Amino acid sequence: MEPSTTSRRNFIKQCVIGGVAVYSAPLLWEMSRANAAMVSPELAAQWQTQVNGQFKPKFRNDGIAKVTGQKVYGRDYRAMDMQGWPKQQGYAFILRTTDAAHIYQGFSLDHLPASAKPYKVITAADLVRDNITLPEFYGDNMLLSEGKTADYLGQAVAILLFDNFPAFKQAKSLLQFDANLLQFGEKTAFVSESKDPYATWRLIRVEGENGAREDIYSPLHDGLFFPSVKDRKPEWLSNPNAQGSVSERGIFYAGEIDKQITDAKANQQWQVLEREYRTQIIEPMMMEPEAFNGWFDAASQTFHTVVTSQSPQDFQEMAVHMLSSGPLAGKVKHLVVHSPYIGGGFGAKDHSIFPYYGVLTAMYAKGPIRLANDRFEQFQSGLKRHPFIMKSRLAVDKSTLKIQALTSQMTIDGGGRVNFTPSVASVGATAMQSIYYTPRNDITATAYASRNPDAGSVRGYGTLQSMTAMECMIHEIADELKVDPFKLRAANVMESGQRNTQGAIPNGTLRYREMLDMAEQDSVWQNRVASKKDYETKHPGMRYGVGFAIATKDYGTGAAAPSAVIRLSKEGKIALDIGFIEMGTGTQTSQAVLVSDALGNFADEVRLAEVDIWKAMQLVQTDNPYIISQQRQDEMAANPRWTPVKAMASSASMSAYYQSHVTRIAAELIYRHGLWPAAVSIWNELYFNTPMGSTNLHNSRDGRWVDGKLTALGFPPLSIDIIAKRAHDMGLVVGVMGHAFNRWAWAEADFDILGTKERLALDALALQYGEASPTFATTFNPKDRQASMTSNGYHLIDRQAISYPKAELNNAMVTYYAPCATLVEVAINEGNGEVTLLSAHTWLEAGKVIVKELVEGQIQGGLAMGIGHALHEGLPPFENGAGNGTWNLNRYQVSLARHVGVWKQRHTILPQLSDTDPTRGIAEVVMIPVVAALIEAVYQATQVRFYELPMTAKKIKEAMA
C-alpha cells in the first residue's frame, strides 16, 4: 500500500507539541458526511421548517442520518474504513486484576492453543524498560508490576496483542473470566490505606448584619484554607482566633457555629436534625463503551488515532507525552487525532484513562490495533459516579421557620485514581445548600482513595448526592416541626442578591419562589390526601404516596474557554466550527439553530470536536487558572496572545451557555460587519435615490430577518445568498473566529474591526474578509485586507484593554445556577416492594431556550436517570462490585420504559423574562430533584424513611415488613 501523507487537503491545521506535529483530522466527519450524502438533499433539508416567518427545527439536524444508519460512531471504525491504513485489523485485550489484597506474582498463557496466542504481551516490565509513564493527571502504575499489590480492583496487568479477530476472540473467551489466570502471593494491606486524602475542602460562612452586608467570614471574603494530614486523615488547626489568620478565624467561627447549634438545641429554640445519608456507586451506562483504534505508519513517521473522548484537546497533549518515550521515542513526527461521534458520555469519557491504554497498544503493535471495551470491561474499568457519606445537621428556628445553620461532613470515595475527584468533592460541598439561604454553614468534604474503580466527572458532579441529602432533611425537619414543607421552603428560599455558602452572590434572577408556587398549586399536590385514600381503596395491596423536591445545579467550571468560528461563503452558506463534542445533548443542532438569531438562517454545516483550527488565534496558556495569583494574571494578560485556558472539555451542561456565548458573538460580528453593510449597499444602489438623499440605514439593529431574508425600515427583503455575494465583493467580514474565558464572569477586551473599536466579551478574535472586487473597493486597497490574513488564513486582531475576572473569584467556586423541581406520585406493591411511577411533573428554568424539543428531551432523559439512581441502580463496593469484572446489564438494573411512566410525564419550562435572558446549562439538574422526590413519595406511602440509596424493591419490601 502507499504510505499516507499529511497535507492541508487531508487535515485541517497543525500545531507542534514537544516537537511532534499534531493534526486534528476531519476524515471521519467527512466520511459521515459522505454517507449522509446518500440521502437526497430534499430529505436531509427536512430537519428545518418555517413557522410564522421564522425557521424552526423539526428534528435534530443529524436525525435523517441516524434513522437511515448513516451516523457512525468512533467504536464502529476499523482499519479497512480508514483511508491510507493497512486493511488488516489487529486487536488488543487487557488483563485486569480482581484482587487488591495480595501480592501479584504474574500469569502464564501456556494453556492457550497456538491459534489463540498473542504476538505480543505488554507488561509493566516493558514500561519500566522503555521508560513509559502515564500523563501526570492519571498518576502512576499504568500496568501492575509483579511483586506489588494492586492499587485498585480492575487495575490493568497486561495487554495482549493479536493480529486477527479469531485469535483475539478465542483467547478472550478463555481468559476473561478465568479466576485462576493471575497468580497471587501473600496477603497485604490495601494500597489505598497508605494514601493521603485526594482533597479536603471546607466552606465556613457567617453572614454579616441581616445577611445584606459583607460577610463576617466566608471563602470569598477571606479565602480558602486547608488542613494538614496526619495518619492519612485531615487535621485542622486547634488554635481558633477571631483576629488571627484565615485558617485561625475559620476554625474560630466553625466552633462558634457548633456552639450555637448545641446551645439552641438545648434550650429548644432551634429544631436540629442530625442525619447520615449514603449514596451508591453508579455506572454511567453510556450508549457505546469506550474504544480506540490506532496505527503507527513508520514510512511517514505518523501515529494515527481514533478516540472516543469528551476531551480530545487534552488527549493530544497527553498522547505526545507518552510518545516521547518507549519504542517509538524520536520516531513520531506527526500525531493524527480523529475525534468522531463518541456514542454518549455522561462525563465518563471526560479525561478517562482508557485512550492512553490505546496509545500504549499502538506503540507496540505491528499494525493497526483496536482496543474496545465490551460491557463487562466497561463496568470493570470505566469511570463511576462517586459514592458519598454525609453526616449533616440542619438547624431551624422554631418560631420563624428560618434556617439558622447547616453543617455537613462529607466523605467521598474517589476510587483507585484521583481523576476529577477533588473537583467533584468541591462542587458537592458548594451544592449542599440547594435553593435555601443559610446564614451560617460549616461544610467539609474529604475525598479518599479506595480499591474501588476510578470515579470521575459523571453527570451530576457531586451535586446529585449532596442536594438530595438536603432535600431529605427539609422533608424530615418539616415533619418534625409539623409544618407544610412548602411553607418551610417559602420561609428559606434564597432570593436574588443573597449569598451562597461561599459568600458569593449567584448571577441573575433567582426564580425559586416562582417555581415553588407553581408546584404547590399542582393538582397532584393539592389532592394528595384524597388521592391516597381513593387509590388505596381501589387498589388493595398497593400504597400511594406523593413527593416533591427542588434543586439548583451549578453549571460551569470557573475556567470555561469556548471557541467558535463561523464562515459565510459567497453563496450564502453558513459553516460553524466548534470544539465541542456531540454527546447526545443536541449541541450540533442547537448551535446550528443559534446562529439564525443574527444571520437569519440555520448553519448549513456544523463541524464538531475541532482542535487545531484554533491555532489561528495563536493562544498561549501558562498557568493553572484555579490557583493563579492576581499579580501573575495581570502580568501575563499584557500579552495579547495569552489566555488563562486555551480549550475546555465537553460536558453536558456547558454548551447551552458557554459555547453559545462565543457562537452568538461570532454570528453577530458577521452580521454587523458583513451582512448589514452589504445589504445597505444593495438598498442604496437599487431601491433609493441615494445621490439625492440618505436612507438613514445607519443602525444595524433596524434589520429584521423574515423567512430567511433581511429587511429594514420597509426596504425589500434580501436573501442571504445575495447579501453574502455583496459582502464578499466589498471585502467585508465573512469569517469570525473567537475565544472567550469565563471565571464566573466573562473576560472583555477592545478590538478594532475595520476601523471601528468594539468592546466584546472575548479575549481573542481573528477575522476573514471577502476578496473584494475593484468595483466596490473604492475606499481601501483589496489586497491589503487579504494580505492581513496571515494567521492560518485569518487576520488576528490584537486585543486592547483586556479585563479578566479577578483571580479571587476562584474562591466563589460557583455562581451560575439552573433550578429544577419534580413532583411525583407513586404506588408501591406491598407484596414485592416494587414502585410504580403514576405520574411526574418537572418544572425547569432554562433561561432563553434555543431548541425547546432538545430541552424536553433532557427533561425526559434526566428523569429516567434520576429514577434509576433512586430506585434501581447501584454497584456494591470492593470485591463484590464492578472491579471484579462480572457486572453487566444482566445484574445491573437501569430504568426501563415501564419504570419511568412514559405517558404520564408532564413538564413546565418557565418562560424567559426577556429576549436578553442567557441560556442555562440544564442537562444535569434535570436528573436531580426526582431522587429526593421519590424518597419522600416512598415515605408518604410506607412511613419508612430511607437514608441510603438505591431504594430497591427488596429493601422497600423488607422495610414495610
What is each of the regions a protein language model found here?
Residues M1-T6, N10, S32-A34:
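N-terminal secretory signal peptides
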Residues N10-M31:
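N-terminal export signals
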